C-alpha cells in the first residue's frame, strides 16, 4: 500500500493525496452479494431534510458484509480483497468449504489465499472470529458485538481496534480507541486483529468536487446567512454575540447529546476528550 501525492498539473490536483493498494481486485464485485443502495438526499420519509449537507454523489451498490461471522467450524479461504465505497475499510471475499461466499471486513495483514475460521475452536490469529471469553486478555480485536448474535458494532472503520483489558465472569472489559472503557458480555464475538487500510486517514480529497462525488454538499456558516435563515445571521460585522446554536436554536459545539441511561452501568470509564 502506498500514499501517493499527485503532481500539481492543475489546481484540483495540487493538494490531492491518494492511497493506492495494488492488492485490491480491479474487476467488478461479486454480484450475488450486492444490493441496491438508493440515495436519500438527507431526507426522511416525509421528504424533510433530517441531515444537512447530503445530496448527489456517484451511484453505489451496497455490499452485503457478514458482521455476524457465524459459520462455525467451516474453514474459508480469502479469494480477493476489494474496495467498498460504503465504508473506509476494505472488504475481503471469502469462499467457505461448503461453497458459500461472503464478504467480511479485511483485517490488517490479510491477503488472498489466507485461511480463516469462526467458532470457539478457531486459532488465535488475525481474521478469525471467536467469543471473547475464548480470546486472551490483552488481545486487539475489531468488529465487536455488543449483544451476542447481533453482529459486530464496535471498531469497524479503517485502522480501528479494541483491546480486551480484563475478563470477570460473564463480562469482559474493553478499551476503545476513544479512551472509553466498557463492559460487554463475554459471549459476544469479536474478530482478532485490527481493521486494515489504516492509511485511509492520510488521504486528501484536494478539491470540493471530490467531496461532491461522495455525496457531501457545502456547509455554510450561520454568520454568513441572513437573520431569517439562522440565529447567527445578520448584523453589521461578523460577531453574533451569543452562545453558538444550531439553525433550530439548540445549543451546539460541545453540548452532550447522549441520553441512553439504560447502558450507563456498563461504562467503566468515560471517553477522554
UniProtKB/Swiss-Prot annotation:
Pfam families in alphabetical order: Ribosomal_L2, Ribosomal_L2_C
Comp. bias regions, Low complexity: 39-48
Biological process, per Gene Ontology: cytoplasmic translation
GO molecular function: rRNA binding; structural constituent of ribosome; transferase activity
Positions of disulphide bridges: none
Keyword check for Manganese: no
Alphabetized PROSITE patterns for the sequence: RIBOSOMAL_L2
Residue intervals passing through the bilayer: none
InterPro entries attached to this UniProt entry: NA-bd_OB-fold, Rib_uL2_dom2, Ribosomal_uL2, Ribosomal_uL2_bac/org-type, Ribosomal_uL2_C, Ribosomal_uL2_CS, Ribosomal_uL2_dom3, Ribosomal_uL2_RNA-bd_dom
GO cellular component, as recorded: cytosol; large ribosomal subunit
Region (Disordered): 28-53, 221-273
Keywords recorded for this protein, A-Z: Ribonucleoprotein, Ribosomal protein, RNA-binding, rRNA-binding
Assembly and oligomerization: Part of the 50S ribosomal subunit. Forms a bridge to the 30S subunit in the 70S ribosome.
NCBIfam families in the cross-refs: rplB_bact (TIGR01171)
Family per record: Belongs to the universal ribosomal protein uL2 family.
Role of this protein: One of the primary rRNA binding proteins. Required for association of the 30S and 50S subunits to form the 70S ribosome, for tRNA binding and peptide bond formation. It has been suggested to have peptidyltransferase activity; this is somewhat controversial. Makes several contacts with the 16S rRNA in the 70S ribosome.
The protein, known as: Large ribosomal subunit protein uL2
Organism of origin: Klebsiella pneumoniae subsp. pneumoniae (strain ATCC 700721 / MGH 78578)
